[in-house]
């Protein structure tokens, strides 16, 4: 009755990405840049207004509900908060058995053995399968979430900031587990984070997002060691250095102002209000993501 139109938000705008089997693609950017929306769009949890999502030749954006459900066997997600992503009323056994039963990939007689195998894969003892989420630590809960994502043996896993809610010591364990699973199972992993210090340890390539667009894409080492855009340089400068003497003397890049509103984005390059190198052309022209060097794209 009182609904009114206040504007249109392009949370993800013109993004083109591909992920190969066995590859880890790191997706980084400031909070609110569209990383999580992109992840949900890939999974078709959020409807697309344009473009396509293709998984092994199948266009998910034009598929019906039944086909999307079938495709999700090959496309799974690990959410950010292990305290919210697990049903508190379901035991670990129920949580891991549910996708197996829904998709009919395992007979009831084999469910117990399959759940035990999944728990061992992520470093948990099968004797805990009748426990509830509140009986586990944050790191253990995230291992359960990873096991649930692995239950259907997917081709692609999207991990949306899977370690940001965990202690630093636990973060390393989860990162090592994900890297081990990628190698062992030949998974494709899209690893989303806002912290480049985390992403650089696990990614083969890194894509940098700003206000819904991919602005820099390349091999992880190249992006970290030779960032081309000011927004990427600012993210790299925020990576802490273990040596306190170096940390005290190194220059930290702080971008002026706040990210523009996606409801009313600036004209031209969306970064120009905060860019120290902005010129008049930046206010009028949207820079396309284009090849800059071998295996490197820059907007």
Predicted regions mapped to residue ranges:
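ABC transporter nucleotide-binding domains
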Residues: 1-226, 237, 297
């Amino acid at each position: 009755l009182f609904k009114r139109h206040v504007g249109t938000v392009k949370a993800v705008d013109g993004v083109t990405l591909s992920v190969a089997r066995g590859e880890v693609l790191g997706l980084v950017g400031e909070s609110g840049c569209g990383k999580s929306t992109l992840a949900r769009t890939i999974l078709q949890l959020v409807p697309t207004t344009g473009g396509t999502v293709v998984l092994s030749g199948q266009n998910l954006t034009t598929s019906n509900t039944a086909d999307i459900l079938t495709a999700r066997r090959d496309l799974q997600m690990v959410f950010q908060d292990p305290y919210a992503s697990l049903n508190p009323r379901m035991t670990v056994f129920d949580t891991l058995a549910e996708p197996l039963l829904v998709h009919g990939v395992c007979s009831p007689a084999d469910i117990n053995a399959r759940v035990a195998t999944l728990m061992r894969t992520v470093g948990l003892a099968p004797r805990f399968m009748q426990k509830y989420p509140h009986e586990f630590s944050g790191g253990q809960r995230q291992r359960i979430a990873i096991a649930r994502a692995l239950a259907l043996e997917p081709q692609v896993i999207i991990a949306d900031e899977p370690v940001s809610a965990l202690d630093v010591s636990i973060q390393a364990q989860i990162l090592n587990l994900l890297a081990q699973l990628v190698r062992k199972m030949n998974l494709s992993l899209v690893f989303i984070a806002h912290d480049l210090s985390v992403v650089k340890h696990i990614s083969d390539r890194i894509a940098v997002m700003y206000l819904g667009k991919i602005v820099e894409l390349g091999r992880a080492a190249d992006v970290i060691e030779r960032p081309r855009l000011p927004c990427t340089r600012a993210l790299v400068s925020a990576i802490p250095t273990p040596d306190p003497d170096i940390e005290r003397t190194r220059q930290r890049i702080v971008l002026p102002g706040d990210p523009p509103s996606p409801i009313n984005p600036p004209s031209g390059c969306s970064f120009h209000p905060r860019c120290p190198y902005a010129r008049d052309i930046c206010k009028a022209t949207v820079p396309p993501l284009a090849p800059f060097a071998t295996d490197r794209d820059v907007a």
